[in-house]
């Protein structure tokens, strides 16, 4: 971020909106010296020294034009000092040989409200101020010809420099003007000299090398930190002095790794560490441009040594063998600038972080906090999600283990999915809650790698299990014969093992060292390998999701095609029914119907079984929506008198609101003798799918049909061999006294059925006797008959006949097929909902993940922020909590199993 400008060592807050005002170096020197107990004379001497430096530098400003970096900084300095200067574009100040403002300003771009950025600026600021200040020029004190003689002391220039850094504390002035110039204030003097076009004898080479610190350093490092608050807060809670002290301590322990500088020539700003003084001041004593260039190049060496002595994130030191030594080809402005940018980038942008827990060096200084963090205690509420996720997925696993009806191929995959969700709740979510509440990652790196690896493995396993489920559903719907032939537990177990093996293969590289990259941050648990992020996101999410969407689309098309065919063949008219067809007779109602016989004009009533017991195997939830709907053709009761032709009359079904149904006559069917002498002793072979019909009394009776009466209704006839039926419910009860038929009322008998379509078993297993299921008794209401009177009347109609229930296998098979198809559709819909919720929960995270990797890989400023990552990550975790809820709502079998386990049903 290039604005607002801030002079880090000369900050003066106006108190209004945090506006920063620049202060001259002379004022700063006096103030600082006075604050540290220095005399007024000392402060005045420091101020005078600074002004002398600026004057001396300005006198040489015409020898060389400033570099592009110097011109850019110069322009902005001028704008700050003089509001009449152009506010944009450096061209307006091109070629200017000095600032138009008082000397002594160090331009740095700082967002004072961002701690991480502040720490990033502190790195460049401290390197600049203490690194250059410790070996600063004495040009103003002893003259240019002596500039290199007093720069540093000690046999080893590099170590002496580090010791000088250690002795220089922030906001402190040394006891003398010379020490102050050599120490704290030399950098500002140097910056002013370079902005004024210093480095005359060296043709600006030394000056360009110094400007590179401000130009290349800030552009390479600080501009990158502006949009990465948490990524580059590398100094955090460490004080500036502590950083330098630690650096010096590390240097003493690792002298063998440094780059040995040349110290053969101190004259004329020669090579070696002390050549920095000549290069920086631009006073190469020999008057040769190479001398100034050497000063700049050796300045690069200092930075490289600084890098060599700095411990990296895991406590080791950067090897000195990688140091780039200066040479003829890289001296001068261009070579020095490139070296500085490279070394400074290697030092800072590669992500050096202080990590006390991992350092093995003998560091005596306290580590302190990595950075100032805020604890988010509100995030503790998120602990509810792992608890609820654990509870729900345990219910899923126990339900399948305990209920044999749930032990299907699809549900085995659901168990595998529940195990993955269970691991998310136990292993992944707690670490995520900790990280969010604590505000920083303070656990060892190996724990972070384990957390990330389990996150990858579990989410990958979840989606691979959904892929396996979608393949299973696709084969079951599109190739049912093949599916029934090949499905077995062994194949399912192998598939599940393969799913987990692939998931582990994708996530395991994280714990094997793949995440140990140079830019790793100890207090942030994240994944830093952009290539692996791209690979894992594609292989574990995007490609499988494309496969699942394709499979489910084909499943839905197949189901839609099947539904169309079922609707086309749905509910034919009674006249179109063939032998063996089934029309169900409902027995579980409150009060059904009444009929009368024309021949006697005697009102008869059919008394329903009021104490009915439901013996159906399937619930209403499992009935096929394409089955015969309860409309006007659904409820049928047949009565007959032996002396008249068969009549079917109006029937009333009472289910809260009466529904009137008209049915037809069937002259071909015969009922048994009302005397009850030929009652059948057989019932349906499966009580679960009983059909409330009537049985043939005898072979002879089945063939003795009376001709149709001319007065019968003109409706289409009921086909031969049809059995009457309504729903898959049958009722049985013991008749009470009121239930017995009264004299003069014909009893309901049985209707003939095509024996080829009927299989019968003895009725002995029916609890109360199905034959007593329905009787004719009450006089609640009557209906007039719909046929003409017959001259014959059965004198024995007072005897209660019985009623026999049969099962037609053909109809039962169709019913089972419909029920099975219904279950297949419901299971597929449930799994499709699971898939949709999964995509909704995880797609945002993987989108952010792959965007971050692409931006990092191609070095674009488009990476999503920390807030987006946190929100999308937790949205993905919530998917593990939602899955059991989906089963509870949309799957009645799981719902029943859940209730049973929790003792709620």
From Swiss-Prot:
Matches recorded under Gene3D superfamilies: Rhodopsin 7-helix transmembrane proteins
Entry's Gene Ontology molecular function annotations: dopamine neurotransmitter receptor activity, coupled via Gi/Go; G protein-coupled amine receptor activity; G protein-coupled receptor activity
Membrane topology summary: Multi-pass membrane protein
CDD domains: 7tmA_D2-like_dopamine_R (cd15053)
Polar residues: bias regions: 723-734
Cysteines paired by S-S bonds: 448-525
Record topology, Cytoplasmic segments: 399-416, 472-493, 553-830, 891-905
BP-aspect Gene Ontology terms: anesthesia-resistant memory; G protein-coupled dopamine receptor signaling pathway; G protein-coupled receptor signaling pathway
Compositionally biased residues, Basic and acidic residues: 735-746
Sequence ranges of Low complexity compositional bias: 702-722
Membrane spanning residue stretches: 378-398, 417-437, 451-471, 494-514, 532-552, 831-851, 870-890
Tissue note: Highest expression is in adult heads.
GO CC aspect terms: membrane; plasma membrane; synapse
Keywords annotated in UniProt: Cell membrane, Disulfide bond, G-protein coupled receptor, Glycoprotein, Membrane, Receptor, Transducer, Transmembrane, Transmembrane helix
Domain of life: Eukaryota
Segments in the Extracellular topological domain: 1-377, 438-450, 515-531, 852-869
Subcellular locations according to the entry: Cell membrane
Region Disordered, residue ranges: 1-23, 600-631, 702-753, 780-799
Primary site of residence: membrane
Entry function: Receptor for dopamine. The activity of this receptor is mediated by G proteins which inhibit adenylyl cyclase.
Family according to the record: Belongs to the G-protein coupled receptor 1 family.
Name by which UniProt lists this protein: Dopamine D2-like receptor
Protein's organism: Drosophila melanogaster (Fruit fly)
This protein's encoding gene: Dop2R
């Amino acid at each position: 971020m290039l604005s607002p400008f801030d002079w880090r060592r000369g900050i003066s807050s106006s108190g209004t909106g945090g506006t920063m005002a620049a202060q001259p170096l002379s004022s700063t020197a006096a103030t600082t010296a006075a604050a540290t107990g220095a005399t007024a004379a000392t402060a005045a001497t420091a101020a005078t020294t600074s002004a002398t430096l600026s004057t001396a530098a300005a006198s040489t400003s015409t020898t060389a034009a400033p570099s592009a970096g110097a011109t850019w900084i110069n322009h902005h300095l001028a704008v700050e000092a003089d509001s009449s200067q152009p506010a944009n574009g450096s061209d307006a100040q091109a070629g200017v040989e000095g600032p138009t403002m008082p000397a002594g300003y160090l331009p740095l771009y700082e967002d004072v409200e961002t701690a991480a950025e502040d720490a990033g600026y502190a790195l460049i600021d401290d390197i600049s101020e203490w690194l250059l200040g410790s070996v600063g020029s004495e040009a103003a004190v002893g003259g240019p010809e002596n500039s290199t003689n007093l720069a540093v002391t000690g046999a080893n220039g590099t170590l002496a420099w580090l010791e000088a850094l250690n002795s220089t504390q922030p906001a402190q002035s040394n006891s003398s003007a010379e020490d102050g110039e050599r120490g704290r204030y030399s950098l500002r003097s140097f910056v002013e000299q370079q902005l004024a076009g210093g480095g005359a004898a060296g043709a600006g080479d030394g000056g360009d090398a110094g400007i590179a610190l401000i130009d290349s350093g800030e552009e390479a490092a600080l501009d990158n930190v502006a949009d990465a608050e948490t990524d580059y807060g590398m100094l955090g809670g460490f004080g500036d002095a502590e950083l330098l002290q630690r650096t010096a301590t590390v240097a003493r322990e690792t002298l063998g790794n440094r780059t040995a500088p040349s110290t053969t020539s101190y004259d004329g700003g020669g090579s070696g560490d002390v050549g920095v003084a000549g290069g920086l001041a631009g006073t190469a004593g020999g008057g040769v441009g190479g001398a100034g260039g050497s000063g700049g190049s050796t300045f690069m060496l200092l930075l490289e040594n600084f890098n060599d002595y700095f411990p990296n994130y895991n406590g080791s030191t950067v090897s000195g063998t990688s140091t780039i030594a200066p040479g003829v080809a890289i001296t001068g402005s261009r070579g020095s600038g490139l070296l500085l940018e490279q070394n400074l980038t290697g030092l800072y942008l590669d992500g050096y972080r202080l990590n006390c827990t991992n350092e093995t060096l003998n560091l005596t200084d306290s580590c302190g906090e990595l950075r100032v963090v805020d604890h988010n205690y509100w995030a503790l509420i998120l602990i509810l999600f792992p608890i609820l996720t654990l509870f729900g997925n345990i219910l899923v696993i126990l339900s399948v283990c305990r209920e044999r009806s749930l032990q299907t191929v699809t549900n085995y995959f659901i168990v595998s999915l529940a195990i993955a969700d269970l691991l998310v709740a136990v292993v992944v979510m707690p670490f995520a809650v900790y990280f969010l509440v604590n505000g920083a990652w303070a656990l060892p790196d190996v724990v972070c790698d384990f957390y990330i690896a389990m996150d990858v493995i579990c989410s990958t396993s979840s989606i691979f299990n959904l892929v396996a489920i979608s393949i299973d559903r696709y084969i079951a719907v599109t190739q049912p014969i093949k599916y029934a032939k090949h499905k077995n537990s062994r194949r399912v177990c192998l598939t599940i093992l393969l799913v987990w093996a692939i998931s582990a293969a994708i996530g395991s590289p994280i714990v094997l060292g793949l995440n140990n990259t140079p830019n790793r941050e100890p207090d942030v648990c994240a994944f830093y390998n952009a290539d692996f992020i791209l690979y894992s996101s594609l292989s574990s999410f995007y490609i499988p999701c494309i496969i699942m969407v394709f499979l489910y689309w084909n499943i839905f098309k197949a189901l839609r095609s099947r539904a169309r065919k079922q609707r086309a063949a749905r509910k034919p008219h009674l006249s179109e029914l063939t032998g063996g067809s089934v029309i169900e007779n409902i027995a579980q109602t409150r009060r059904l119907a009444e009929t009368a016989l024309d021949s006697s004009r005697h009102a008869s009533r059919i008394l329903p079984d009021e104490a009915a017991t439901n013996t159906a195997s399937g619930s209403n939830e499992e009935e096929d929506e394409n089955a015969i709907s309860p409309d006007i053709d659904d409820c049928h009761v047949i009565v007959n008198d032996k002396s008249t032709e068969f009549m079917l009359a109006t029937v009333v079904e009472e289910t809260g609101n009466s529904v009137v149904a008209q049915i037809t006559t069937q002259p071909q069917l015969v009922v048994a003798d009302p005397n009850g002498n030929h009652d059948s002793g057989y019932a349906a072979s499966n009580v679960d799918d009983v059909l409330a019909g009537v049985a043939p009394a005898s072979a002879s009776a089945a063939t003795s049909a009376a001709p149709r009466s001319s007065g019968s209704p003109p409706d289409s006839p009921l086909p031969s061999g049809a059995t009457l039926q309504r729903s898959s419910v049958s009722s049985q009860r013991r008749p009470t006294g009121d239930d017995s038929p009264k004299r003069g009322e014909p009893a309901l008998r049985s209707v003939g059925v095509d024996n080829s379509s009927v299989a019968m078993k003895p009725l002995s297993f029916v609890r109360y006797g199905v034959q007593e299921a329905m009787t004719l008794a009450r006089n609640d209401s009557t209906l007039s008959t719909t046929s003409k009177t017959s001259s014959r009347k059965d004198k024995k109609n007072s005897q209660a006949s019985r009623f026999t229930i049969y099962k037609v296998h053909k109809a039962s098979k169709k019913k089972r097929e419909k029920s099975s198809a219904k279950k297949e559709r419901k299971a597929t819909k449930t799994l499709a909902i699971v898939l949709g919720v999964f995509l909704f929960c995880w797609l945002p995270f993987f989108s952010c993940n792959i965007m971050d990797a692409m931006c990092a890989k191609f070095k674009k400023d488009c990476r999503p922020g920390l807030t987006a990552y946190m929100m999308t990550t937790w949205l993905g975790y919530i998917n593990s909590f939602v899955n059991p809820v989906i089963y509870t709502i949309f799957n009645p079998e799981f719902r029943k199993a859940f209730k049973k386990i929790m003792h709620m049903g």
